[in-house]
């Protein structure tokens, strides 16, 4: 799927719509600095949790038993079985996504069963992701579930829960990221796990983070943890 510059994509609230890329698929978001792609709510008066956000599933490795996991919110399988020759691809390419904004997304079905603004699930290092914003998301702004994807020039604004989150052995890079916490319903700037069920699971999470800026809301934030980590 290729989305041209200047396109607006509307997510339907009633059906809890989300844009899901299955393993082997590619999404190219071809926004530009002057003409970005916008993914937003179809509601006349938009609000967080109006739709499900962007989910990318790939063939890179995880540290879960068997190597394959099923995405929260029934968003499909991701990862790979290391015992199957040629199935795992650390350089898996799920497309090129640049100059776009995601607004009013994220769905909380139940605790630990939620959709993020952007979910990179078993995504490989061949995937390109830069110059994006996640705005007013119900759950995490961006979460990496294992894999080796990298991203840069990201802005996470007013996201509930955590702005950046990872688990299941993420091993990518992130640079030039600005986080502005939601003053009323945020958790942490970053939540970092190797694997909640087994802290020694391999491959271990080992991302490299550079040039992060965190902005809290200590004046209005009664419910926000206002924490960096």
Kindly give the residue locations of the regions a language model identified.
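Beta-strand/loop edge motif enriched in small/polar residues
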Residues: 1-229
